[in-house]
């Protein structure tokens, strides 16, 4: 019988789920270097997939404990944009179904833009409910960034299509009667908070890219409003915009000059 090509072996390995598969045993006996490399790669991919499953299970601990108590609508809440000099603070509340699984889900800041966009679409497709809260720079200046973040989180909860039975919040406590747990670095410890961080990050990044189109001299689509050298130089040359947070240094100092 004619041996399969290396490409055919690669395609076959993509179909094989475990070592007991007769086709896998056949490939293991193939002594060609190209096939043996593919088998090594297959093992590495399986190992990575197992680690991702274990990490996801670990990040589902809070949700699973609450589900064991009979709760269904558990909302993870996170914010993006507390530190920038321009643009809104954006929060998201996400309620995920029990069978939800995305390998590699993590804090949005640790993901590439391409992965965030892909995960954003998957979360949108599978979440039970998603709520977003957006607070403008003007309101941030009026009530301060901490209060604005809290308000944005409350707005995100109010914008959910279901009433959550429990809130898992990244490092904040909210003035609400809904039971809640505040989790430090929650976006790396809870799948719901992680999903919320991705929704909030992609939502805000898209808004800042639009702002970049409106004000091309400022480069908002690159720094997302953070105080980079490029951003500060643009403010010095072109001035402060209505989208800037005038209560934040160094914008505040520039206005007072």
UniProtKB/Swiss-Prot annotation:
Name used for this protein in its record: Ribonuclease HII
HAMAP family referenced in this protein's UniProt entry, alphabetically: RNase_HII_B
Recorded family membership: Belongs to the RNase HII family.
Gene3D superfamilies referenced in this protein's UniProt entry, alphabetically: Ribonuclease H-like superfamily/Ribonuclease H
Keywords, comma-separated and alphabetical: Cytoplasm, Endonuclease, Hydrolase, Manganese, Metal-binding, Nuclease
Matching CDD domains: RNase_HII_bacteria_HII_like
A biological process from GO: mismatch repair
Domain RNase H type-2 span(s) in chain numbering: 72-257
Cofactors demanded by this protein: Mn(2+); Mg(2+)
Co-factor: note: Manganese or magnesium. Binds 1 divalent metal ion per monomer in the absence of substrate. May bind a second metal ion after substrate binding.
Catalytic activity field: Endonucleolytic cleavage to 5'-phosphomonoester
